[in-house]
């Protein structure tokens, strides 16, 4: 069962999963300033529990996290809501997603460090698609 599409209400909602506290706070502040509603968690397991409760437009997730990594989170999230757009942010530029990773088929990867305007521009491109 797909979760309701938040775009129907015109709300651009981002679910952020990032285990680095300072990076998470920075991203929330910056994305809210850019006009997005952001709900953030420090691990994939908590983020997935929230995703089961309400719809989001985009999942923005680190790859390496405790409890549930970003790839597993993306896989489970896309099973729950196939329309959910997914972007990975990672400090491990060499991380490659296997082609069999169903959640990663249309996902974008942004390597840390990145400039905030690049992140916002990439999010805008994904949400416009």
Task: Give the location of each predicted region.
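Non-catalytic signal-transmission and effector/linker regions of two-component phosphorelay proteins
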Residues: 1-15, 117-129
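Short hydrophobic/Thr-rich beta-strand motif most characteristic of the beta2 strand and flanking loop
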Residues: 35-42, 50
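Charged docking surfaces used in two-component/phosphorelay signaling
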Residues: 22-33
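Acidic catalytic/metal-coordinating carboxylates
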Residues: 19, 43-46, 69-73
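Active-site residues of response regulator receiver
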Residues: 62
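Receiver (REC) domain active-site loop signature in two-component systems and cognate sites
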Residues: 65
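Alpha4 helix (beta4-alpha4-beta5 surface) of REC/receiver domains from two-component response regulators
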Residues: 72, 92-111, 117-124
């Amino acid at each position: 069962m797909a979760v309701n599409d938040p775009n129907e209400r015109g709300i651009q909602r981002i679910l952020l999963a990032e285990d680095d506290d300072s990076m998470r706070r920075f991203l929330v502040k910056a994305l809210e300033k850019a006009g997005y509603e952001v709900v953030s968690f420090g691990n994939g397991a908590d983020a997935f529990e929230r995703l089961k409760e309400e719809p989001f437009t985009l999942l923005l997730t680190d790859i390496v996290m405790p409890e549930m990594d970003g790839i597993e989170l993306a896989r489970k999230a896309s099973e729950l809501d196939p329309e959910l757009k997914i972007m990975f942010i990672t400090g491990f530029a060499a991380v490659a997603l296997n082609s069999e990773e169903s959640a990663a088929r249309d996902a974008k990867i942004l390597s840390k460090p990145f400039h905030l305007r690049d992140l916002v521009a990439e999010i805008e491109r994904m949400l416009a698609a």
